A protein has these predicted regions:
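Short, surface-exposed alpha-helix to beta-strand junction/turn motifs within ectodomains of secreted
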Residues: 15-17, 21-43
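Contiguous beta-strand segments within globular domains
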Residues: 7-17
Length: 93
């Protein structure tokens, strides 16, 4: 959440990603960037309590605009996944 290429009327409070395997928290991260290339998340990526397959990061109130989620994770089976995807906020903070 949000979904890839989602258009949201309200900004999300956080980004939460779900993977098929358990993640190694020390080697897994997610961040959110604005159109100017500035990191906008609260720099607190962490596994979701009780679910080692979910990674989340908290967001401040975001103004309308296009954002990019970037992540790099290491699963316990040794696979590294690195990717990014955009989402757009159209509504108020």
């Amino acid at each position: 959440m949000p979904a890839r290429r989602a258009t949201l009327a309200q900004p999300p409070a956080r980004v939460e990603l779900t993977f098929t395997e358990r993640l190694e928290p020390a080697y897994s991260t997610v961040s959110v960037w604005n159109e100017a290339g500035t990191r906008v998340d609260l720099r607190d990526p962490a596994l979701v309590a009780g679910n080692p397959r979910r990674l989340a990061v908290t967001l401040p109130p975001l103004p309308p605009g296009r954002y990019t989620v970037r992540f790099r994770v290491l699963s316990v089976d040794g696979h590294v996944v690195e990717a990014d995807f955009p989402f757009t906020v159209t509504g108020p903070r």
